[in-house]
Structure formats: structure tokens, C-alpha cells
Amino acid sequence: MGSIEAAERTTVGLAAKDPSGILTPYTYTLRNTGPDDVYIKIHYCGVCHSDLHQIKNDLGMSNYPMVPGHEVVGEVLEVGSNVTRFKVGEIVGVGLLVGCCKSCRACDSEIEQYCNKKIWSYNDVYTDGKITQGGFAESTVVEQKFVVKIPEGLAPEQVAPLLCAGVTVYSPLSHFGLKTPGLRGGILGLGGVGHMGVKVAKALGHHVTVISSSDKKKKEALEDLGADNYLVSSDTVGMQEAADSLDYIIDTVPVGHPLEPYLSLLKIDGKLILMGVINTPLQFVTPMVMLGRKSITGSFVGSVKETEEMLEFWKEKGLTSMIEIVTMDYINKAFERLEKNDVRYRFVVDVKGSKFEE
């Protein structure tokens, strides 16, 4: 085994068959493999809140059967004849994308996540007409351009959530020039992405305030994650005292919420960076932005280049993800708990250690 040239394979995964979102075994054919492809045996796959949206058709764009999962870590089993970046036996990662046009402004700038013709790692159609399926499966085939090198020394189960949640917070801090030590940042929402935000911001030398709707995560934020301050959004006095204090806020909340209370926390030229996938309009009055030259912006995961840079940063700083490892037979329960925000802070599925039965 060493190279692959257009041989089809079957694999088995867990798929949602309808908007109930219940995952059951599903055997399917992997797309044709070619000279630029990498055949990967999946070891671990993270569970993201967007997976929950997809399996339940919350965004009205789901196609079934659907194998979710876009935080994939696995072992290279074979490579195509043109593959130069990877070799058999290496541990690699795959994130949210498996294709792009390679000729637009975004692709030319190596920010392929903003390509209008990007191809999602699941619930999409590949260039050969086959439906893409995700990481809750035994194996996958991915073009080498979208496969991520993983630095030696990083535990594979730790890497899985970094391929989405980790780079999601790292990318805007890098792009918007917010990596300077001493900045004061806010993390709105302390879930899977939010806990990554605290870790990355602290590692950059920032003063970090966690903002939440209740005080139930205060101890975790301050003692376990090392945040410097904790604000409860309903605490009028505390919010007023914190006005004009933050250089940026990373807003990870995945449901509709008012923006004005958080805009008031920003300094002049401060940035509110939206990351949650929300299918209802958000509202604010324009003076909240105008009178402080503040910005409401967004950011979407990160490029392969940014992901590899973030993984090196993670290794250099000695950071770890706070995860709960589960096997495939627990995945439906994991989604139930995720829907109730009952996870600390990210589920990772041990795919290699799971049994698949059709």
C-alpha cells in the first residue's frame, strides 16, 4: 500500500436519516480517489454544535442520509501519486472543507473558507457528483490540499476540536491584529468554542473577561481556565462598571441575543466578532456603533494555513483542550447533552475504538 488511483471503496459510519437527528449505522461508497488524494483511517472526530444544526435541519439545508463530523484526526493509509505533503503512517487532520474553486480572490489569498464554491466536508456534493460524508465513519478520502499536518507531540484526541473550535477563535485574533500582549478581551459564551477562546487569549497574554448569562460557570472560568474576570450579562451594575473596557469580544453564542449590552463594553475602535451560527436577525441601534467607531464583524473557521499555524502555537504554548471522550454507541446521547449545553467543554468521539454494525 502506498498510492491510490481511482479505486472505489466502501466504508461504514453513523448517519442521520431524517430531521430527528438520530444517528444509525450506514454503509456507503467513498468517492473515487485520484492522484492528489489521501486515504485516511479515522481515529478521532470532534462533535461541534454546527453538527447538531445540520442533523436536525435547523438551517433548512440538510440532505439525508448524512454522516456528520468535521473535526477529523486519523492515520494516512495510502496516498495518490502526486501527493508530496504526506506519507503513509502519518497522523493528519481534516476540518470543515474538502474543496474550493482554487481560482477566486479568496483561494488566491489562501483563505479558502471564504470561497463561494467551497465544498463542505459533509452534506455537500463533491466535484465528481458524490455526496460528501463526514468524520463519524471508519475512513475517508480527502484531497491533500485540505489535509492538515499535525505537529509531533500533540495528542490526536486533543487535536480534534482544534480543527474547528480552535482555529475559529485563533483566525480572527490573527487577522484583526489582536495578538498583541496586554489587550483586554471578552469571551461571550463559555462552551466548546468559548473555552478555546479563553485558552488562546490567555496564551497571547491578554486580560480575559468571560461574559455569561448566569454565574454557574464562574468558578470554572476563573479557576480552571484562568480567566481574569467574569461578568453576568443580567448584572446591570457589573455591566455598567465594565463599560468601555474591552478591545474585542468574541461572541460564540449560537442563538439569538441582543448586541447592545456587549457593544457598550467595547472601547473606542473595539470589535464585536460574531461566530455563532444564528438563523434569526440580530438587532442593535446604530449610535451604539457610531459613537465609539466600533465594529460588528464576523469570522468563519480558518484556512488550512491558519489551522497549521494554530496547531504550532498550541504546541508551543503547551495548551490542552478540555474534552470528554466517548465512543460511537454514545453519540446520540452526546448530541442530547450538547443540545442542553451539558458538556465540559467538547465531546470527542473515539472512532478507532468504536464498533460499527450495519
Curated annotation (Swiss-Prot):
What pathway, per the record? Aromatic compound metabolism; phenylpropanoid biosynthesis
The Swiss-Prot or TrEMBL record lists the needed cofactor(s) as: Zn(2+)
What keywords are assigned to this protein? Lignin biosynthesis, Metal-binding, NADP, Oxidoreductase, Zinc
Q: Specify which residues bind Zn(2+) 1 according to the UniProt entry for this protein.
A: 48, 70-71, 164
The EC number on file is 1.1.1.195
Query: What tissues express this gene product?
Result: Most actively expressed in stem, hypocotyl and root tissue.
Any idea which positions bind NADP(+)? 50, 168, 189-194, 212-217, 252, 276, 299-301
Show the PROSITE patterns listed in the entry.
Answer: ADH_ZINC
Q: Specify one Pfam family.
A: ADH_zinc_N
Q: Quote the InterPro entries the UniProt record gives.
A: ADH-like_C, ADH-like_N, ADH_Zn_CS, CAD-like, GroES-like_sf, NAD(P)-bd_dom_sf, PKS_ER
GO molecular function annotations of the record: cinnamyl-alcohol dehydrogenase activity; coniferyl-alcohol dehydrogenase activity; zinc ion binding
Provide the residue positions that the database annotates as binding Zn(2+) 2.
101, 104, 107, 115
Description of how the protein assembles with itself and partners: Homodimer.
UniProt function note: This protein catalyzes the final step in a branch of phenylpropanoid synthesis specific for production of lignin monomers. It acts on coniferyl-, sinapyl-, 4-coumaryl- and cinnamyl-alcohol.
Q: What protein name is recorded for this chain?
A: Probable cinnamyl alcohol dehydrogenase
Q: What is the primary gene name for this protein? A: CAD2
